[in-house]
Amino acid sequence: MALPLLPGFSLGRNVGKEKFHKSQHWGYCNNVAMLLAEDKPGIGGEPLPGQKLIPKSSVFPAELGCGAPAWLAFDKQVLSFDAYFEEEVPDKNQEPYRIRHCKIYFYLEDDTIQVLEPQVKNSGIIQGTIVRRHRIPLPSPNEDQFYTIDHFNINAEVIFYARRYKIIDCDQFTKHFLRKMGFKLNPPGNRPDDPYTKERQKILDSMNPLRPYERIDTLKQFLEHDGHVLRFYCVWDDPESLFHDPRELVLHYYLSDDTIDIKEVIPVNSGRDVVPLFLRRDKLPKYAPTGLYQPGTITSRTVLNVFGNLVGNRGRYILDNRKTGAVHQEFYRDSDLKIGAVINVWGRQIMLCDCDEFTKDYYRTKYGIEDFTPVPYKAPPPPKAEKPIPPYTGFGSEEDSLCSCMSLLPKPPQKDFKKFMEKDRCGLESNTLRFLAKLVTDSPIDKDRKFIICYFLMMPLYSVFEHSQRNTGIIGGKFLEKGRIKKPGQELFKSEPSEYFKAQDLFIGARVCFHGHNFLLVDADEYTINYMEKHANEFAVADTGFIFKKLKDIAEPRSREIRQVFAAADPQHTKVIEYDPFRNLIVSITDGAFSEHEIMTLGRHYGEKEEYEIDHHFLLAKAQEQLKKNSFENFEQLSTILVYNDREKCGALPYETCRTICKSFKLPLSDDLLQTILTMFEDDHKQVNYKKFVDAVNWREHQIPSFHTIKLPPKNEDDWNGQPPFLPVKRIKYLPLLDDLFGKEE
C-alpha cells in the first residue's frame, strides 16, 4: 500500500526536473474535436501510468559527461551487413528461384537504411541500388515504427517492403560496434549459391576454345615506363641541300609504347622555318618507305572466311593462328639505338651522336653498356669577336664612359646589389676592415703621424682618417674621403679598365700608395683579423694551411738546425716562448719571405689560449631569473616528460633529447644558456642527469640569490683610435709547430 502524499512522508519528485510542459492530446480533425494521439507522454515528457513509450530511433548508451547527439557522434559511420534474398522466377523450369546477394548499410547518424546489389556479369537483371537510403518502416501491424539498430544481427531476417532478407555476416567494424552496444552476435551463416548461375559457370568452365584470341597486353609496359623517355642527339647530312650542311636533330624514344618522335634544332639566323616536329610520334619502321598498303592490309589479327560464297551470301569467319598473308613489319626498339648507329627515318640516314644522362643510366643498367663516347658532329664554335672599346675620355667614371659606348642610349653602370646586401652593416657586423698605418717618408714630422685606413666591404671604397695628436701642429681628421683608389703606375686615357686596390691588398706589413702617399700597414683591429681568418679562402695571409705549407717548403731542409734554434730560445724548457722571439726566429728562418700578418696568423694558431672558468652558480642564477620573469612554473610536468622518455630508468638522457624536450616546453631560456647548463650536468658518456637539471633551474623550490650584473659601457668598433690593441697572443707553443713541420722527434 502506497503512502499518502502527506508533507514530510513523500520525496520531492520535481527535484532536478527541467521540463514541465503538457503534451497536446486533443485537437481538431475536419473541424471535429477528437483525441489525436494516445501514445503521447504526460507532463514533462514522463509516461502516464501504465504507458510504455517506444523510442522512435536507436537508443545508444550514454557516455561520460555531456554526450554529443547521434548525428554528430556517429557521422560517416555505417554498419555493413552481407545478406541475400530469394526471388521466384515464374514460367521457367530451369530456374525456379534465384538467389540474389546484396549489401545492407545501416547509417548510425539517422537510422537510415540502404540496400545495394553488386554487379554480376551477364545476369540480365538491373542491379545496383535496390532500396534507396531512407528510414524503412517495420512490417504490419507495426508499420508506425521504423527499423533501429536493435533489429539487426547475424543469422537474422529483416523484411523490407514485403521482401525477406537473410543476414549472413557483417564486417569487422560492425561486429566490434555491436559488441560494444551489448549485443550477443550469432555465428555467421552460409552463403548459398544461385543454382542457375552455378550451372552456367560449369558450362563456361567446360568450354575450351580451339582457336583463342591472341592476347595483346601493353598495360604492364605502360605502367612501368610511363614518363620514361630516351633522348639522343642526332645529325642528318641533307644531300639535297646546296652546301650539304648538317641538320641537328633530337630523337625521343618513349619506353611506354616504343614510339619515336624527332625534333629539329634550328640555329639562329639560319633562314629555315621553325616547325614543331621533324617526325611526329609513332612507331618507326626499319625498312621504309616500302609503298602504301591498302586499307585493312595491316591489322592486329588475321581472319579467314571458311565457306566463302558457297552458302548463299553468308560467310563463316574464324581467327587464323598461322596468320596467312599477314604483313609483318619490323620497328625500331631500344636495343637498336646506340651512339654511333645510323637509323633509317623514312629514307633519311640519321646518325646518333650523343645521349643524356638518363639514357646512359638506362643502357648501363639494362644492357651493361659502359662506352658512351660521343661522336663529334659539329665544329667548335668560333671565338667570339671582342668588341673594340674606345679609350677613356676623362669625363665621369670609367664605368660610366664604358656604358655609353655599349648601346645607343646610354645607361648608368650597374652596381653589385647582391654584394651590397650581403656585406652591408648588420648589427655588430660592421663589415669594415680597419688598419693602422704610417707614412713611409724621411720627414721627421710625418714619421710619427698615425692614420686609420678603412675598407668598406659592401662597396669597394676606402677612407683614411688621421689620428689627432697633441703638440704636433697637425690637425687630425679626414685625410681622404670615401672612394675607390687606383693602383699607381697606370695610364689615364686607355681602353682597358683600371685596376683598383682590393681587400686582398691590405694586410699587416703591406705597403700601399694612395694618390702619391706611401703607407705602411702596421696593425689592425681584432674584428679585421678575425674576419680575415674566417674568410681564409679570400685572404692568403690569414690562411693557416697555405702559410704552413709555405713554411714547410722553406724550413724542411734545415729541420735539425731549426729545432736547435728554438730549443736555445727556451733555456728553461717550458715548451713555450714569447711572441717577439718567435717572430724574430721566423723572420731569420724565412729570410724575410713572410709578412708580419703571416707571422701573426701562425702565432695565433699555435699560441696559448686563455681558458676562462665558467661560474656555474652565476649561470644558474641567471637562468632562474629568466624563468621567474617569464612566470614559468611547469617544472613538475617537465620532470614527468623527462622520466617518461627515460626508457631504461637510469636517471640520465642524451643531451639532444633533453634539449629537444626543453624546446618543446618553450623553456624561456636562450639557446646558448640552455646548452651551457645542460653541459654542466653531463657525465662521461654524454648523458644529462635530468633530475639535477630540473632541480637546479626550479626557482620555486631551490632558489639561488641573484647577482647584480655590472653594466660595462658597450664597445663600439668605430671608436678605435688606432692604438695597438692588447696582444691576443703572448706565448707560443713551438713544439706542436715543430712536430707538424718535421714530425715528432724520437
Swiss-Prot record:
GO cellular component entries: axonemal microtubule
EF-hand domain residues: 557-592
Protein's GO biological process: regulation of neuron projection development
Matching SUPFAM superfamilies: EF-hand
Subcellular location(s) per record: Cytoplasm, Cytoskeleton, Cilium axoneme
Boundaries of every DM10 domain copy: 75-182, 226-367, 429-536
Cleavable signal peptide: none
Keywords: Cell projection, Cytoplasm, Cytoskeleton, Repeat
PROSITE patterns: DM10 (PS51336)
Stated role: Microtubule inner protein (MIP) part of the dynein-decorated doublet microtubules (DMTs) in cilia axoneme, which is required for motile cilia beating.
Descriptive protein name: EF-hand domain-containing family member C2
